[in-house]
């Protein structure tokens, strides 16, 4: 595994521990409503802090763009980590076990490494540019469908109105 992907995996798992603990203790979740069904919680902030700490420990010179903290400039602008510490905050708040930790690394403007971790199911999706994607260490492939009919599509709808 690429060393930077390894750090992303470690960071995602660390954040996942924060999220799972909070999910099992909903009375400790502090919620601020930003808009209709748009929340931020102490869990978002704590998970983000765990990710940032893990990345900065290994790569202090890298930049980070995080959902809650915004941009944290590093001394090497070629490396930029993109973090969504809790994708699915609304589900967490409502007790629905469908959320994930998402981390990507851009190098010179191109996404090179990515991790999506579902801490409830312990499903770890990883991808490296040019090497495909994996689920829990096993290669995954896309279907062969050429038309949208006959496929399964899942999406989330953003809460911000345009």
Where are these regions (language model features)?
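N-terminal subdomain of lithium-sensitive/metallo-dependent phosphomonoesterases centered on the IMPase/IPPase/PAP
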Residues: 1-86
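Residue-level signal for inorganic ion chemistry
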Residues: 19, 44, 55, 89, ...
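A short, compositionally biased
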Residues: 26, 99, 127-131
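Short capping/connector residues at structural and topological boundaries
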Residues: 34-36, 44-45, 97, 145, ...
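Short, well-ordered turn and helix-capping elements at secondary-structure junctions
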Residues: 35, 68-70, 86-89, 137, ...
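Glycine-rich active-site/cofactor-binding loop and its immediate structural neighborhood
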Residues: 77-119
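Acidic beta-strand-loop-alpha-helix segment within the catalytic core
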Residues: 104-162
